[in-house]
Regions:
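Structural core segment of the AMP-binding/adenylate-forming
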Residues: 1-64
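Conserved AMP-binding/adenylation subdomain of ANL enzymes
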Residues: 110-126, 133-175, 181-191
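A short helix->loop->beta-strand "cap" motif at the edges of active sites that frequently abuts
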Residues: 39-43, 151, 197-200
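Short coil-to-helix segment of the ABC ATPase nucleotide-binding domain corresponding to the Q-loop/switch region
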Residues: 105-106
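Conserved pre-ATP/AMP-binding loop-to-beta segment of ANL
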Residues: 53, 57-60, 65-91, 98, ...
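Adenylate-forming
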Residues: 17-33, 157-160, 173-205
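Conserved S/T- and glycine-rich ATP-binding loop of Class I adenylate-forming
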Residues: 86, 92-95, 127, 133, ...
């Protein structure tokens, strides 16, 4: 994994690296310490968590720096963006070689907006976030769904059907997303112990 992180950060010309210090069993801070010296183009690192590699700053410091950017500058930068400008590079898992970057432009946002309208997503919806956010499915159907509608996401570090359905009951989760294995686990564990759920929609990829 450290080799993949080293390659993708360097190959994408990343200048700002934002990461959790740890997520589930993965120690990202340790990875950065191991390979970070190989990133001459990285100008700043922002860490969510207490384990911060040398030269990095915390999330609150990063947000505070935004107060130095004027509304006029922000508006000018926003106006300069075209729909066909690159927005995100999502990398493959690199199962046969090094990860390959798939470039998506800003029209992705319009596509996601249209899906939220089709599904009737509102600010009152609550999503369960257990899909990897560096994959297209998790990024669009969970992260962007929430960002574009102002809803809420309950994040999980790993997939655990029992824990997710328990949280769905207590947090009022209305949306679940997943693959056939996710849904198979959900159906199995809920049949064994039914919950009072507020679910109204699920997506299957």
């Amino acid at each position: 994994r450290a080799e993949d992180v080293q390659y993708t950060v360097d190959q994408s010309d990343t200048s700002t690296l934002i990461f959790n210090d740890k997520s589930g069993p993965i120690d990202y801070a340790a990875m950065v310490r191991e390979v970070g010296a190989e990133w001459p183009k990285v100008e700043r690192m922002v860490v969510l968590g207490d384990d911060r590699p040398d030269g990095s700053i915390g999330w609150s410091e990063f947000l505070a720096a935004g107060t130095t950017v004027s509304d006029e500058t922000l508006a000018a930068r926003s106006a300069a963006v075209r729909f066909d400008d690159p927005m995100i590079i999502i990398y493959t898992s690199g199962t046969t070689s090094l990860p390959k970057g798939a470039v998506h432009n800003h029209s992705v946002i319009r596509n996601v907006v249209e899906r939220t309208q089709m599904h009737g997503v509102t600010v009152d919806d609550v999503h369960a976030g257990y899909l990897p956010l560096f994959h297209a499915f998790g990024y669009t159907e969970v992260a962007l769904f929430t960002i574009l509608t102002g809803g809420k996401t309950v994040l999980f570090e790993t997939f655990d059907a029992e824990a997710i359905l328990d949280a769905a009951e207590t947090e009022g989760i209305t949306f679940l997303h997943g693959f056939d294995t996710h849904w198979g686990d959900f159906l199995r564990v809920n049949a064994a112990r039914p919950r009072q759920l507020a679910l109204r929609l699920g997506t299957l990829a």
